[in-house]
Amino acid sequence: MLNKEEIIVPKNLEEEMKESYLRYSMSVIISRALPDARDGLKPSQRRILYAMKQLNLTPGVKHRKCAKICGDTSGDYHPHGESVIYPTLVRMAQDWAMRYPLVDGQGNFGSIDGDPAAAMRYTEARLTHSAIFLLEDLDKDTVDMVPNYDETKYEPVVFPSKFPNLLCNGSSGIAVGMATNIPPHNLGELIEATLLVLANSQTSIEDILEVMPGPDFPTGGIICGTEGIRSTYYTGRGKLRLRARMHVEENSDKQRENIILTEMPYNVNKSRLIEQIAELINEKTLTGISDVRDESDKDGIRVVLELKKGESSEVVINRLYKFTDVQVTFGANMLALDKNLPRTMNIHRMISAWIRHRMDVIQRRTRYELNKAEARAHILEGFLKALSCMDEVVKTIRESSNKEHAKQQLVELFSFSEAQALAILELRLYQLTGLEADKVQKEYSELLEKITYYRKVLAEEELVKDIIREELQELHKVHKTPRRTRIEMDAGDVRDIEDIISDESVIITISGDDYVKRMPVKVFREQKRGGQGVTGFDMKKGSDFLKAVYSASTKDYLLIFTNFGQCYWLKVWRLPEGERRAKGKPIINFLEGIRPGEQVAAVLNVKRFEQGEYLFLATKKGVVKKVSLDAFGSPRKKGIRALEIDDGDELIAARHIANDEEKVMLFTRLGMAVRFPHDKVRPMGRAARGVRGVSLKNEQDFVVSCQVVTEDQSVLVVCDNGFGKRSLVCDFRETNRGSVGVRSIVINQRNGDVLGAISVTDCDSILLMSAQGQAIRINMQDVRVMGRATQGVRLVNLREGDTLVAMEKLSINTESVETEENLAASVQSGQDTIEE
């Protein structure tokens, strides 16, 4: 049974659902999820800040309980429950969530580890200076006020917003069918960009990028590349790749490295990141990390990733980027309410929206000030008029029966307005003195000047812009802060570990105990022949000695041949980088399957494994073998067989043959040399034994060097005692493979036995290293060409008891290199051949 007042309206269910959902969607979009482009706030944030203003919680006053703030907000402006309001209040107080926090919290407001804030009954808050800038001039009719939900109070639809808060603090939210994710920016940079647009509305986005290169996140970190920034600024949408900021420190034991994370990517939970890394370590996805520690304190973030002994920090960092939140993507979508409609805006349009709003605020504020000044001037005009005939005015007032009668008499007899008459009636007697009259006249004159100025501002738009400009410049002067987020222009996608490795020439050293390291070429300064050099390897008497030195490029492939005839495949950048005096790390850490007594005998660096090119291998007893280079292009974890070694023999050299014109030279310890075309040795399989390359003079003699040469080159033969000789290749008679050969240098007490030989040109320099770690670099232009059978000249002054143990060629492309910087620039990456 229906009451008379009840009415039932039949309606199609589909239409009702469509209309209701549309109303709900618009409510979420306009009144909940999206920020306003003018003040950068959502309704819930705006209502909390307004409630705090009503409580007079300015920066200088005592904090108030958050429960009180949330209660007033819920009861007066935002009827959604305190438990919904409090998280919004908390976020506005977190300095890792907001670039410029709007709430000054006292108590536990959570942490970057994801810890929740304490209950609202325990925490307290007040407004920050940034929030005051948003609220400034709110009481001067600068924005529209609308009734609250129950029409008992009024609230602002937007704040005056003295700075572009939307771009300063950013915003995120999910509406119906759309979402926003606006990154925060640096206030100082944003003000400079705003001043550009203010001065010229046609300012290009390129000009904006000059002064505001990109977002500035509260947690710092790194933005990789500028492509995502440019896309965001031009279109309003883009993907920013964010990385944690980290550095590498040497462990206290000097044998390992630690990766130190000091800044997190935006919105990354530090505690969850540490858990993620630990899980990947347990799953063997991150194999190079032995321990993870969180050493963060009140001074800042410090997460320590302790690496295993011999692990490359570059490799581990790359895998952190690939598998963890050390690198994340921030999907920027600059969607905001512009004129009450959701719009995706580029950076220029977003700045312009704030400028339009601020101009409207300035004009409304000026109009308010003008009305106030005109009203006051009107009263002062009445005072001045009354002072000019004060006796008559006083007499009229005394003769009136009451206040209302006095007001009417003043209006009728002296032509005062009602407002002027009321003001005169409220004057105190002391204000009728001459001194007070002068003050009234002065105030009136000042008001007339202000009125003239206010009217001029309202009439000229350029003056409004000048006011905005002055306010921004004052903010810039007082509240400018350094940028926190670094932008790395050359950072790219990590698709391959080598993407983070720079391509540079390096020196690789191996000690007698098989400790290996790599060093930049520039650490060795070139000297004249006969110099004493610099310390290239720090040795203590009776301890390890330097066995070999090689040159390569960081992105080359290293084929590492052992004395047992085994070949291992390795990238140069995987080797640990050390200083000149550093000993390095055991090479066994980088090569799996090394057997007892097995040592590195030769290293070859190649950029690619081409068909038609060969490796030429030589043993200590004069056995040689030629193998196709592409046979070594498929590495195995525990190495592959390169040469079948006879008992008592061992591999001593490996050479790269690229064309048919190259010939092979073998040099022996007792000063003999043999030269023959490489086609005298047919290509063989990897497991083959090889053929005789040179016949040794006696059991004390053995092969010390194998070189691949051309006719236009010369060879430098170096002896143990620091003497050597440079001779033309053509001076060495070509012989058959397997012959004894010809004399390469005179062997005597002064020279000592032959250390090695190497092919050179005038554009080369030679690096010599001694058993005690002495190193010298010599330009081949300083070593003249001599006859084949001569004794040679002094190449290096060795300390008493010291002998040379290693030599290496470095190709350079300048005639004279005097500085470390020029020397480093002259090295031709990847073109050197390498030998012990």
Curated annotation (Swiss-Prot):
Gene Ontology CC: one annotated term: cytoplasm
Domain of life assignment: Bacteria
InterPro entries (alphabetical): GyrA, GyrA/parC_rep, Gyrase/topoIV_suA_C, Topo_IIA-like_dom_sf, Topo_IIA_A/C_ab, Topo_IIA_A_a_sf, Topo_IIA_dom_A, Type_II_DNA_Topoisomerases
EC number: 5.6.2.2
Entry keyword set: ATP-binding, Cytoplasm, DNA-binding, Isomerase, Nucleotide-binding, Topoisomerase
GO terms for MF: ATP binding; DNA binding; DNA negative supercoiling activity
Cytoplasm as UniProt keyword: yes
Active-site residues, Swiss-Prot/TrEMBL: Y122 (o-(5'-phospho-dna)-tyrosine intermediate)
Motif GyrA-box: where in chain: 527-533
Pfam families found in the cross-reference section: DNA_gyraseA_C, DNA_topoisoIV
Compartment list: Cytoplasm
Reactions it catalyzes: ATP-dependent breakage, passage and rejoining of double-stranded DNA
GO biological process: DNA topological change; DNA-templated DNA replication
Principal cellular location given in the protein's record: cytoplasm
Additional record remark: Few gyrases are as efficient as E.coli at forming negative supercoils. Not all organisms have 2 type II topoisomerases; in organisms with a single type II topoisomerase this enzyme also has to decatenate newly replicated chromosomes.
Subunit structure: Heterotetramer, composed of two GyrA and two GyrB chains. In the heterotetramer, GyrA contains the active site tyrosine that forms a transient covalent intermediate with DNA, while GyrB binds cofactors and catalyzes ATP hydrolysis.
PANTHER family in UniProt: DNA GYRASE SUBUNIT A, CHLOROPLASTIC_MITOCHONDRIAL, DNA GYRASE/TOPOISOMERASE SUBUNIT A
HAMAP family: GyrA
Record protein name field: DNA gyrase subunit A
Species for this entry: Chlamydia trachomatis serovar D (strain ATCC VR-885 / DSM 19411 / UW-3/Cx)
